[in-house]
Amino acid sequence: MATQFNRPPLRRITDFKSKLVGGGARPNLFEVELAFPEEIAIDKDVKDKARFLVKAAALPASNITPIDVNFRGRILKIAGDRTFDTWTITVINDTDFSIRSAFEKWMNSINRLSDATGANNPADYQEDAYVHQLDRDGSTLRSYRFYDVFPTNISQMDLSYETVDTIEEFTVELQVLYFGSIKGVGDNAGGESIS
């Protein structure tokens, strides 16, 4: 006997419009807030610059790895451990190299170029960072706090006589202990805070 399915109701564009709260979140409306270890003594202006010059980031992925348990030719999936992806940001380089220099100093405090010594205590080289998803009125829809991040890769910046009409950019890969989400304060803010 065939299973009967109820036909879904007709969906109209006006129904869709009523469900798209606030006109939808825009991927170009965001701001990144960085912190650097006190030990590296960077100018406080660098943190403010980063709010403008970090041109790309990501809201974090959420992963729980499955555990496969075999049973008589079948595989039972059991929830395993939570894992956290590397968080990558893209930075526009200005002529004073202040943000790149801050990340280079941070990495050097972890493992010095000259002699491979560096900070032993994670509290000395890990900091929290935030990415804020903004609404079109400038209010914060939702924020993500990345706990205990530290850089593990600063990308190279290619130089060439043939490159014109371009500003240098570089990426930074940051390791993340875990993250939490913070509900925004605007009229369209959604979701619940989770940590």
Q: Each PLM stretch: what is its role?
A:
Residues M1-S195:
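Glycine-rich, low-complexity intrinsically disordered segments
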